[in-house]
Design a protein with these regions (language model features):
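Long, contiguous N-terminal structural blocks used for assembly/anchoring
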Residues: 1-92, 161-243, 308-392
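Acidic, proline/glycine-rich low-complexity IDRs
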Residues: 1-19, 25, 94-189, 248-334, ...
Length: 453
């Protein structure tokens, strides 16, 4: 077949990179010059009738598409503003989601071409500054336009399902759609990711899981608030009193971003955590909420894990069993922390699990004695490290106190050794090998980290 063809309906095209390409008659939105028309033909078999009809449909509705696409892009930008803000440097407050304008939005992206897929689906493809590899696209040919990635448009796989409605594959692992969720005083969009290949589609366990989620999603938000409350109050006992009194709890620092449903029907949210500008996996499909790393949620059915009645899920990691927990050290900022139980090639012992369970029952009663231990250590060894560090005035022996001395610590993990010894491990500028706060019989002792690990 020739590399140049002329069609009465479509015009004259040149074949390039698996598609027929030509310039259209006019610019569209913020395209640089006349908009490019790209018609997919990977195997160079010629333009299909369904693609010609798709182009006619586009021309008949072009003005409507141009008028609505900006609204869809603005909504998408607002729902994904954290991703943009974290990916692009040198931006100012005019790009915040509450004040973003159409003019500002189009400084972040450029319309490249109208793309017509082999099945007649079509949409606008954009380059964007926050994802240069995958870009962004608006699929226009559906009953309601859908914002997807440019790579999804160019390798489009669609599935119309009675439970999920229109699903679009991400060309990696998931079928995707969107759901809306009332979150405090706003409505947020949660991307739904249903595990499955292009060939396999989705299964009944996943449909059942999604129906269950839709039925209980408001309840899941309430459960999440109750789960987080002990961390914020610093006491499980206080949290239980609060909840027993019927008071409603909401935590805005943890915002659902994605709903992941695996092949077995396990499901949970991937939540944005404001305190560390990161993400956390939250399993929702069981009676109790469990938090974990994002990849542990995504691979939940495949992960090597165990569930303890008191401690919850533990995941196998090399010579350890690990768990993700949340803590507010000294009633400061919330931290996402890791429990590490050293077992080598065995399962945790009853003693190790008992120590972990007992630790959770102390309701942060350790924090005050930890301050005393740290101050005692600091004053005792001050002469050993004062020449090696730049000591601020407030941390000199004259001014240091039990409240500010702990500011030099960075906690890294809660460690449980083979023998059942348990301690918070932390980094300190005063000790190259780190410090540890060991808990024994309800008491705290500060030791050098190598003594326990």
């Amino acid at each position: 077949m020739e590399d140049l063809i002329k069609n009465d309906i479509l015009g004259e095209f040149k074949f390039k990179n698996g598609a027929w390409v030509r310039l259209m008659d006019n610019p569209v939105l913020n395209s640089k010059g006349n908009l490019k028309l790209v018609i997919q033909d990977t195997n160079k078999e010629g333009i299909l009738d369904i693609q010609r009809e798709a182009y006619k449909t586009y021309l008949q509705n072009e003005e409507r598409y141009k008028s609505c696409v900006t609204d869809y892009l603005l909504d998408y930008y607002k729902w994904n503003n954290e991703v943009f803000m974290n990916s692009v440097s040198g931006i100012d407050e005019t790009y915040y989601k509450d004040v973003i304008t159409e003019e500002k939005l189009f400084t972040t992206m450029t319309l490249w071409y109208l793309f017509i897929c082999r099945d007649g689906s079509f949409g606008y493809a954009f380059g964007c500054c926050w994802d240069k590899e995958n870009g962004i696209a608006v699929l226009l040919s559906e009953s309601e336009p859908r914002v997807i990635s440019r790579t999804q448009l160019e390798n489009l796989h669609k599935l119309n399902d009675n439970t999920f409605s229109l699903l679009i594959h991400d060309n990696e692992r998931y079928w995707t759609t969107w759901d809306e969720l009332s979150f405090f005083d706003e409505t947020i969009r949660v991307q739904v990711e249903v595990e499955g290949s292009v060939e396999d589609g989705v299964n009944n366990a996943q449909r059942k899981a999604y129906n269950d989620y839709l039925l209980h999603k408001t309840e899941h938000l309430r459960r999440l608030g109750n789960f987080l409350l002990p961390t914020y109050l610093g006491s499980k006992a206080e949290a239980d009193k609060f909840i027993a009194a019927g008071q409603q709890v909401g935590v805005k620092d943890v915002m659902p971003s994605r709903l992941v449903i695996d092949k077995k029907g396990n499901y949970g949210w991937i939540c944005y955590t404001q305190w560390d500008d990161s993400y956390l996996g939250i399993l929702l499909s069981e009676k109790d909420i469990h938090i974990m790393e994002v990849n542990q949620l995504r691979d939940f059915a495949k992960e090597k894990k165990m569930k303890d009645e008191k401690c919850g899920y533990l995941f196998r990691e090399h010579n350890f069993w690990s768990q993700t927990i949340l803590h507010r050290f000294f009633k400061g900022e919330v931290n996402t922390m890791r429990v590490a139980i050293r077992t080598y090639d065995k399962n945790p012992t009853d003693l190790q699990l008992q120590k972990l369970s007992e630790f959770f029952q102390y309701d942060n009663k350790f924090w005050e004695p930890m301050k005393d231990e740290m101050l005692k250590y600091y004053l005792k060894f001050y002469k050993d490290f004062e020449d090696d560090l730049e000591i601020p005035e407030e941390l000199t022996p004259k001014n240091v106190n039990r409240e500010n001395v702990v500011s030099i610590l960075t906690f890294t993990s809660l460690f449980i050794g083979i023998s059942g010894r348990i301690a918070w491990l932390c980094e300190s500028p005063t000790e190259e090998d780190g410090l540890a706060f060991e808990f024994t019989d309800g008491k705290v002792e500060l030791i050098f980290q190598p003594e326990i690990i």
